[in-house]
C-alpha cells in the first residue's frame, strides 16, 4: 500500500497513536494494527455504521470534530478534499495533536500538468465530490491560520492522472465495466507510469503529501 510509505518519515513505533480521518473501511489502519501499532482509530462519517475488527481495530462513524483525545499522528488520505470546511478541520487537527505531533494530508493539487493538459477531463477534478482543490500556497495559508507549519511536501501522483483522464476524454466513466478491462496497452501503461514519476520529480504531479507540525 503506497499510503504506508508516508510513515517512513514519521518514526512510527508500537506506542504511536494514529487517527485516520475519512478512512473508509480502515484498510490502512488494519495493516498498521497487524504490524504491531497499538493505539489506532479510524473515523469516517460516510460509513454506514461503526466497524469492530477481530484484531481490536475500531472504525467509528464520526466526524473529526467529535474526537476529544490527543494523537501523535493524524492522517487524511485523499479525504481532505471531500471536506466542506477545511479551515475548521485543520483547527481541530491543531487542537488534537499531541506535543511533537504530526499531520499528514494527501490530496490532489493545482497547478499541475494534468489539469493544464486535460482541463475539465482531468480525473482529479471529480466534481461535485471534491469540494476544494488546493495549491501549495492555499495549504500554507490554511496551516498558518491555525498555527500549523508545513515542513515537507512530496509529490506522489500516479498513472491514474493519465488513465482516468483519457477515459473521460473518450466519454467512458472511470468505474465503467470496459474501463476495468483496460483499453490501454502495456506500452501505454508503462509510459503513463514513467511520465507520472517524471512529473513528480519536477513538482508537476497532480497530487502531493503535506507534512504538518505545530
What role is predicted for each listed range?
Residues 2-120, 128-145, 207-214:
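Conserved SAM-binding loop
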Residues 3, 20-23, 148-161:
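Short N-terminal helix-initiation segments at or just after the protein's N-terminus
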Residues 59, 111, 122, 188-189, ...:
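Bulky hydrophobic/aromatic packing residues
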Residues 118-127, 167-175:
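Short glycine/proline- and charge-enriched loop/turn segments
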Residues 136-155, 186-188:
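A SAM-dependent methyltransferase catalytic signature shared across enzymes that methylate proteins
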Residues 154-214:
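A C-terminal cap/extension of S-adenosyl-L-methionine-dependent methyltransferases
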Amino acid at each position: 500500500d503506497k499510503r504506508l510509505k508516508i510513515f517512513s518519515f514519521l518514526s512510527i513505533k508500537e506506542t504511536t497513536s494514529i487517527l485516520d480521518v475519512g478512512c473508509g473501511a480502515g484498510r490502512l489502519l488494519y495493516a498498521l494494527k497487524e504490524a504491531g501499532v497499538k493505539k489506532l482509530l479510524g473515523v469516517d462519517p460516510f460509513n454506514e455504521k461503526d466497524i469492530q475488527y477481530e484484531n481490536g481495530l475500531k472504525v467509528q462513524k464520526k466526524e473529526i470534530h467529535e474526537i476529544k483525545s490527543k494523537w501523535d499522528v493524524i492522517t487524511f488520505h485523499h479525504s481532505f478534499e471531500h471536506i466542506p470546511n477545511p479551515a475548521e478541520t485543520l483547527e481541530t487537527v491543531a487542537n488534537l495533536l499531541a506535543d511533537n505531533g504530526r499531520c499528514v494530508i494527501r490530496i490532489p493539487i493545482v497547478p499541475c500538468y494534468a489539469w493544464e493538459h486535460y482541463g475539465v477531463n482531468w480525473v482529479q477534478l471529480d466534481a461535485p465530490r471534491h469540494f476544494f482543490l488546493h495549491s501549495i500556497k492555499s495549504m500554507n495559508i490554511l496551516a498558518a491560520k491555525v498555527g500549523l507549519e508545513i515542513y515537507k511536501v512530496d509529490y506522489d501522483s500516479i498513472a491514474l492522472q493519465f488513465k482516468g483522464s483519457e477515459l473521460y476524454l473518450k466519454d467512458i466513466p472511470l468505474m465503467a465495466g470496459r474501463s476495468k478491462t483496460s483499453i490501454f496497452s502495456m506500452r501505454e501503461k508503462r509510459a503513463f507510469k514513467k511520465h507520472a514519476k517524471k512529473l513528480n520529480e519536477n513538482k508537476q504531479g497532480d497530487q502531493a503529501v503535506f507534512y504538518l507540525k505545530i
